[in-house]
From Swiss-Prot:
GO CC term, one of those recorded: DNA-directed RNA polymerase complex
Gene behind the chain: rpoC
EC supergroup of this enzyme: transferase
Disulfide-linked positions: none
Keyword terms of this UniProt record: DNA-directed RNA polymerase, Magnesium, Metal-binding, Nucleotidyltransferase, Transcription, Transferase, Zinc
Cofactor names: Mg(2+); Zn(2+)
Gene3D superfamilies: 1.10.132.30, 1.10.150.390, 1.10.1790.20, 1.10.40.90, 2.40.40.20, 2.40.50.100, RNA polymerase II, clamp domain, RNA polymerase Rpb1, domain 3
UniProt GO molecular function: DNA binding; DNA-directed RNA polymerase activity; magnesium ion binding; zinc ion binding
Binding locations of Mg(2+): 460, 462, 464
A GO biological process held by the record: DNA-templated transcription
CDD domains assigned to the protein according to its UniProt record, in alphabetical order: RNAP_beta'_C, RNAP_beta'_N
Name used for this protein in its record: DNA-directed RNA polymerase subunit beta'
């Protein structure tokens, strides 16, 4: 009986594996997979529809077409299982094996595998050290290659043309052998001695001095080492046997009408077989060489197309002129195997429908249409029906359900109770795009969604659709309930703020409810408690907005367990609406939080306070109650838009006339030649922008206040001076914008102010504005101008979405394997956090930056010296507030950047899980969360910041810095200055800053002070707000002397290096240095105009401490302001360089800027940083470049070649610090890493990315950016291999080097040294250790080619790899599953030896 039952068991192979290895298949291996050789190109017999024997679908090779039935029908049924029919040779078994069994084709002539040939860098070329061009000539029969030179002067691997070959054969006879085609290449590979090649290459790397040689040798060495280590042979890159895919994977499907649809692969295989058979026949017939060669070339081409069509030459096309889909095309790209079937699967038990709003739902509920629920929960219903005895079989149960028996609905209710379902809205940009809800059955066909979760899903009800998924197993239901239920996702993982925040109608209702109206009915009444107010309000004795006095019970959180909360009763002056809201406040929230007009921001703060003070459960209930109140009072308020709400200000015509008058004057100035065309345009745009702002201000002033009317008489109230009493306006449009429900001041301005200036699609501004608004209506010209700019917006949106999605994909890919895997890595590293100050404003407080981090050292109160919190403490709200209050300046906190966990992160370095508000759990996939948090707001970023010709960026060039607050001045350590004759302090440092500290020594502001500025304050001086700290000339850059003495010019020759220019207006003559390219006299090209200083005895003044004379070079374009022989004092200006301000560089902003930072691209026209601390000098110029030399303290010179048109900010004899900017321009992040270290790099990337997001009002925690930077830095470059197996200059995972070094140190050998390399996110994803993950990301062919040559092993550490092989991911609940599995395996581990394991593998 048992044996019988075994028959019905599925043939399942449960293989436990820890890693997947990829490599080259040897011909023997291919034959061992195969069940027979495919000899004919035939597929199936067109009459009988049976597969042809020995053909591509042969049943003898691949297995039976029908289950347990041979082809001729002699053996049918299960009892003959395993019999091989003697008539047709088919094994009687399941037809499913046609998906698994492979065949093979014996090739008549070897063929090169196109991937190893053409995928750059060509692996064949690397192994043989022959160029790809030459190999192709051999393979495609254009040249001979010498395989064995014998005693002749030829060399191995030399190419011979047809003529050469004939000549050499005449000359040497049979002393040498040469061959053509893949045979020649194979012979070379076969005869190669890998070990001796490796030896000679290692020697070459040590001895040679040439960089390129070392690079090339290292590349070859890497490939050969891999072959040596993996035990694969290079000649396997040439195919002699071709595997044939199982037929079910390349099916032939009959269509109606006797035609067939076939997979392209069959076509490609048929071509290979046809050519191969023809070649065999030609060889048997001893055909002429030229015919055979042609046939061999065609065979090579057909195998190329089969493996990767279109990689070389023209792609093979089918009958319909469409390129055929080859094996490589099957796996790569969006529609390939990886991304289509392995990473994105369609799932069962799911449905989708349109969503509608469900305002009556609780936060954890969703409305599910009965029809849908019935279909989704069918199996559960069948089971219940059977258990209850309503149906005896599944079939009967099915019938009951189809007939919609009334009992089915009762069962459905029961089945659905407490069985959560998951709702998902595409695109799922972050983890809140899928949440679990408890279904509530509803009539109709649309899913009902709770309004408060719309923000997380980014859903609206204009026709959006959502998908429903049913978690089946108990574990899945449990995870849904504990991790995914919407009530457990109140906070946004991106920044830790609540994401369940009321919006639109709800905000409007709550705002209306909490506004105060002067003279409303019932004003000034006094009530004993809120229920009394409710009665009065219901009976219409009170208005909602009336000001009243009432006693309100405030409940503090209870101290003990089971005690009632402590109540305090306080008397408040408040309004009716606010008192009503106090009823729904949870215990522990003070009434003061709602005793104000509730706008959107305030409501957000309210929910945040509730979460922190009262916990999750109370907050969710509170949010629901807020929603119900908001909707209810928005309905009662009846706020709507009417035309009279759009008030056009009376001053508008006057403002416009004044602007037109100004423009008329400027036009006249332009005509008389006083201003240029560009200046005129800029001024016009400025005037209109200002006029628009004035109109908008007048409009908002008029909108936002209204006179108070008496309730009975309807007359306007006046105060004792006869002035009208005013109050904040109850204008509907104003209320909508003010509350934050919908619209903004900018939109109201277009409705009832003036539309203002419009932009063209290229971002430039049209100088004639639209003076009308929408209330007045536009004329045809105005309408045309406005459509012009609006279209651009639509086009941009479409581009933006695609780009943003691609950025997210790259970010996820680079961080997908970063998971919290231990609690504490024990590092003492960290970064120092300060408040972020820009200009005079605190952009982000210290509290905000350290909240949710772990302190890396004890935080000490600077005044008392006591410890506020000890090392290793998670800084929560209270601690952070305390630190802020104690005026601590900086806190060292742990960071993902310095975490020492090898493959992952530790919980301490990460800190708080922002989405839960608790310390992060082991198993949290923080990498993916970081990627989503940065990618998700990407769609809100702009594609580019327009250099708005004055309109938006009308910030005038600053010419002074003034303090915003009182405090004490502190100079930054970079500042260097000299005192001039007038006793003014002149700055001579490049990156000087002035800090202003408050009385506790806490940094309040930070101002950059440029070179040449005059300082107006001393270090340590106490100043008032508004005091000027420093001033400078904005449009000219001075060259300032640090020495006094008599000037001597050198190489300053009029007409040679300088020209005399006479100013047209002032008539003064000045000397201007001319560009060497434009100098007409040949010998003047190398001359640099410079100035030296002489003392009283006419001796040259030297740089202090050296015998080098002081010399200051004048740059191109400098206007020299001193005369030869003039006496100058310290701090005087020698020359001025005019700065071009009009040429606004189009700064990449928005999304492209974020992508540029994460891709670590070298910016165009990058600035130069000083490589060392030392003295600057200029060397001899080369053509078009100037040479700058920095001599460091040890006397070592560092040279730079800098393009002539670049502005060097340093001058001769100046001392610069390592990492300081010496040539203006955007900074290259690679330089920051090299010169300033990891921390400075992280700070740079963090600040730059945050700038872009902050501009759009998106807040993202720094942690997420640090996580990404950590992944960009995960590879290191070997600077010295020591005794390790690494190669000099090789890039490896840092974890790998650390492990190897530990091993070497225990063996008392020399460890390898390395330096960090910064990789962009795309490169970092592709260079990951996991080839499965890299192949599914981009450049699949290249990744797989490289991995198979290297014989790579994928340890399946990341999330993607595990999804692809179909396992639970090693994150969250899956992490413990994997850990337990591994432990069990280790306890049972016995070593099994497989017959075809190579000796190397056994030895390992």
């Amino acid at each position: 009986m048992k044996a019988l039952l075994d028959l019905f068991k599925q043939v399942t192979q449960k293989e436990e594996f820890d890693s997947i290895k990829i490599g080259l298949a040897s011909p023997e291996k291919i034959r061992s997979w195969s069940y027979g050789e495919v000899k004919k190109p035939e597929t199936i017999n067109y009459r009988t529809f049976k597969p042809e024997r020995d053909g591509l679908f042969c049943a003898k090779i691949f297995g039976p077409v029908k289950d347990y039935e041979c082809l001729c029908g002699k053996y049918k049924r299960l009892k003959h299982r395993g019999v091989i029919c003697e008539k047709c040779g088919v094994e009687v078994t399941l037809s499913r094996i046609r998906r698994e069994r492979m065949g093979h084709i014996e090739l008549a002539s070897p063929v090169a595998h196109i991937w190893f040939l053409k995928s750059l860098p060509s692996r064949l070329g690397l192994v043989l050290d022959i160029t790809l061009r030459d190999i192709e000539r051999v393979l495609y029969f254009e040249a001979y290659i010498v395989t064995d030179p014998g005693m002749t002067p030829l060399t191995r691997g030399q190419l011979l043309t047809e003529d050469d070959y004939l000549n050499k054969t005449e000359e040497f006879g049979d002393d040498f052998s040469a061959a053509m085609g893949a045979e020649g290449i194979r012979a070379l590979l076969n005869s190669m001695d890998i070990l001796s090649e490796i030896e000679s290459l290692r020697l070459e790397i040590q001895t040679t001095g040439s960089e390129t040689k070392i690079k090339k040798a290292a590349k070859r060495l890497k490939v050969l080492e891999a072959f040596n280590k993996s035990g694969m042979k290079p000649e396997w890159m040439i195919l002699t046997v071709l595997p044939v895919l199982p037929p079910e994977l390349r099916p032939l499907v009959p269509l109606d009408g006797g035609r067939f649809a076939t997979s392209d692969l069959n076509d490609l295989y048929r071509r290979v077989i046809n050519r191969n058979n023809r070649l065999k026949r030609l060889l048997e017939l001893r055909a002429p060489e030229i015919i055979i060669r042609n046939e061999k070339r065609m065979l090579q081409e057909s195998v190329d197309s089969l493996l990767d069509n279109g990689r070389r030459g023209k792609a093979m096309t089918g009958a319909n002129k469409r390129p055929l889909k080859s094996l490589a095309d099957m796996i790569k790209g969006k529609g390939g195997r990886f991304r289509q079937n392995l990473l994105g699967k369609r799932v069962d038990y799911s449905g989708r429908s349109v969503i509608v709003v469900g305002p009556q739902l609780k936060l954890h509920q969703c409305g599910l249409p009965k029809k849908m629920a019935l279909e989704l929960f069918k199996p559960f219903i069948f089971n219940k029906l059977e258990v209850m005895g309503v149906a005896s079989t599944i079939k009967a149960a099915k019938r009951e359900v189809e007939n919609e028996n009334p009992i089915v609905w009762d069962i459905l209710e029961e089945v659905i109770r407490e069985h959560p379902v998951m709702l998902n809205r595409a695109p799922t940009l972050h983890r809140l795009g899928i949440q679990a809800f408890e279904p509530v059955l509803i009539e109709g066909k649309a899913i009902q969604l709770h309004p408060l979760v719309c923000a997380a899903f980014n859903a609206d009800f204009d026709g959006d659709q959502m998908a429903v998924h049913v978690p089946l197993s108990l574990e899945a239901q449990m995870e849904c309930r504990t991790l995914m239920l919407s009530t457990n996702n109140v906070l946004s993982p991106a920044n830790g703020d609540p994401i369940i925040v009321p919006s639109q109608d709800i905000v409007l209702g709550l705002y209306y409810m909490t506004r105060e109206k002067v003279g409303a009915q019932g004003e000034g009444m006094v009530f004993s408690d809120v229920s009394e107010i409710t009665r009065a309000y219901e009976s219409k004795a009170l208005e909602l907005n009336a000001r009243i006095t009432v006693r309100i019970k405030e409940k503090k959180k209870s101290c003990g367990h089971g005690e009632d909360p402590i109540e305090t009763i306080t008397r408040f002056e408040t309004t009716v609406g606010r008192a009503l809201i106090s009823e729904i406040l949870p215990a522990g929230l003070p009434f003061a939080l709602v005793n104000k007009t509730l706008k959107k921001k305030e409501i957000s703060k309210l929910i945040n306070a509730s979460f922190r003070l009262c916990g999750l459960r109370e907050t969710v209930i509170f949010a629901d109650k807020l929603m119900y109140s908001g909707f209810s009072y928005a309905t009662r308020g009846g706020i709507s838009i009417c035309l009279d709400d759009l008030v056009t200000p009376s001053q508008k015509t006057g403002i416009i006339q004044a602007a037109e008058q100004e423009i008329h004057e400027i036009a006249n100035q332009y005509i008389s030649g006083l201003v240029t065309q560009g200046e005129r345009y800029n001024k016009v745009v400025d005037i209109w922008a200002r006029a628009g702002d004035q109109v908008a201000k007048a409009m908002m002033d008029q909108l936002s206040v209204e006179p108070v009317k008496d309730q009975e008489t309807g007359e306007i109230r006046t105060d004792k001076n006869g002035q009208a009493v005013t109050q904040e306006s109850f204008n509907s449009i104003y209320m909508m914008a003010d509350s934050g429900a919908r619209g903004s001041a900018a939109q109201i301005r277009q409705l009832s102010g003036m539309r203002g200036l419009m932009a063209k699609p290229d971002g430039s501004i049209i100088e004639t504005p639209i003076t009308a608004n929408f209330r007045e209506g536009l004329n045809i010209l105005q309408y045309f101008i406005s459509t012009h700019g609006a279209r651009k917006g639509l086009a941009d949106t479409a581009l933006k979405t695609a780009n943003s999605g691609y950025l997210t994909r790259r970010l996820v890919d680079v961080t997908q394997d970063l998971v919290i895997i231990e609690n504490d890595c024990g590092t003492d590293g960290g970064v120092v956090m300060k408040a972020l100050v820009e200009g005079g404003n605190v952009v982000e407080s210290l509290r905000g930056r350290i909240l949710g981090r772990v302190a890396a050292t004890d935080v000490i109160n600077p005044e008392t010296g006591e410890v506020i919190c000890s090392e290793g403490t998670l800084l929560d709200e209270d601690t952070a507030d305390e630190i802020e209050a104690c005026s601590v300046d900086e806190v060292k906190v742990r960071t993902p950047l310095t975490c020492e966990t090898r493959y992952g992160l530790c919980a301490k370095c990460y800190g708080r899980d922002l989405g839960r508000g608790t310390p992060v759990n082991v198993g949290e996939a923080v990498g993916v969360i970081a990627a989503q948090s940065i990618g998700e707001p990407g769609t809100q970023l702009t594609m580019r910041t327009f250099h708005i010709g004055g309109a938006a960026s009308r910030a005038v060039v600053a010419n002074q810095a003034e303090s915003k607050s009182n405090g004490v001045v502190r100079y930054s350590h970079h500042i260097r200055y000299v005192k001039n004759a007038q006793n003014e302090l002149i700055i001579i440092s490049r990156s000087g800053e002035i800090l202003i500290q408050d009385e506790n020594g806490r940094e309040r502001e930070r101002h950059k002070i440029p070179y040449g500025a005059t300082l107006h304050v001393q270090d340590g001086e106490t100043i008032k707000a508004g005091q000027i700290l420093g001033s400078w000339e904005p449009h000219k850059r001075p060259i300032i002397t640090e020495y006094a003495g008599k000037i001597r010019f050198e190489n300053v020759e009029e007409g040679v290096t300088v020209v005399r220019q006479i100013d047209e207006i002032t008539g003064m003559a000045t000397l201007v240095v001319i560009d060497p390219k434009r100098r007409n006299i040949a010998q003047s090209k190398g001359l640099r105009p410079l100035v030296k200083f002489l003392d009283e005895n006419d001796q040259e003044i030297n740089i202090p401490g050296t015998d080098q004379p002081v010399s200051i070079t004048f740059h191109v374009g400098s206007i020299i302001t001193v005369r030869d022989g003039q006496q100058v004092g310290i701090g005087e200006v020698l020359a001025r360089i005019p700065q071009e301000t009009s040429k606004t560089r189009d700064i990449t902003g928005g999304l492209p800027r974020v992508a540029e930072l994460f891709e670590a691209r070298v910016p165009k026209d990058a600035g130069f940083l000083a490589e060392a601390t030392g003295t600057v000098a200029f060397g001899k110029d080369t053509k078009g470049k100037q040479r700058l030399v920095i001599t460091d303290l040890d006397g070592i010179a560092h040279e730079y070649l800098i393009p002539k048109d670049k502005h060097v900010t340093a001058h001769d004899g100046q001392v610069v610090n390592k990492g300081e900017v010496i040539v203006d321009g955007p900074i290259d992040p690679h330089d920051i890493l090299r010169l300033q270290g990891v921390e400075a790099l992280a700070k740079y990337i963090s600040d730059e990315v945050q700038d872009v997001y902050r501009l759009q009002g998106v807040s993202i925690n720094d942690k997420h950016i640090e996580v990404i930077v950590r992944q960009m830095l995960r590879r290191v470059q070997i600077t010295n291999a020591g005794d390790s197996a690494f190669i000099l200059g090789e890039q490896v995972e840092r974890a790998e080097v650390l492990a190897e070094n530990e091993k070497l140190i225990t063996e008392n050998k020399m460890p390898a040294t390395y330096e960090y390399v910064l990789l962009g996110i795309t490169k970092a994803s592709l260079s990951t250790d996991s080839f499965i993950s890299a192949a599914s990301f981009q450049e699949t062919t290249r990744v797989l080619t490289e991995a198979s040559i290297m014989g790579k092993k994928d340890d399946l550490r990341g999330l993607k790899e595990n999804v692809i092989v179909g396992r639970l991911i090693p994150a969250g609940t899956g992490l413990s599953f994997h850990n337990i599995r591994k432990k069990q395996r280790l306890s049972e581990s016995t070593v099994y030896l497989d017959a075809d394991l190579t000796e190397n593998e056994i030895a390992e």
